[in-house]
Amino acid sequence: QDSIRLSSRLQATLKMLHGLGEAKETTPASAARGLEVLDEVDVLQSEKTKLQQQLQNYQKEKAALEPWGDFEPESLNLLHDAGFAVNFYCCSEGSYDEAWEEIYNAMIINCVSSRIYFITVTKNEVEVDLDAEQIKLPPYSLTRVQILCQETEQALADNDQKLAVLAEKEQPSLQAALKEVNTEIE
């Protein structure tokens, strides 16, 4: 049973690596090396999945921050420590009430496709009650999220490069391991 599973994993890995490219400068085929390569590919694939999810999250955070521009979240903490609450809101143009500018010190930050993005600056103890969606922003600046996106994209490219190297060099070892496992099954 284990041999059948191993055979399936080897076949799937060979197929995936073959899709990445033809074997070129191959290392001498070794069934033992083939099993090592199988584990290396599993680790790289797992890492790739994590990186892709991480990149998706960073891209969502980036999209959430873009209408607000680039600012340091620490500056909001300084305002809070000084007794002020800064809240972020979004509403349709029709829902925005200019009276909020007087009552809550509302300031429009951006207008994007008939949506108004604005902040309120009030004393900490003042309760803000608006007919608008309150926005929770990520804990870092737009610049930081852009850097995190770039670093994650680079890590994905590095991961793909490692897989491409295995595809170039190690397919014969995987085939040798597959042959050995299939011989055990028979």
Cite the ranges covered by each PLM segment.
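Long, charged N-terminal accessory/stalk domains
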Residues: 1-186
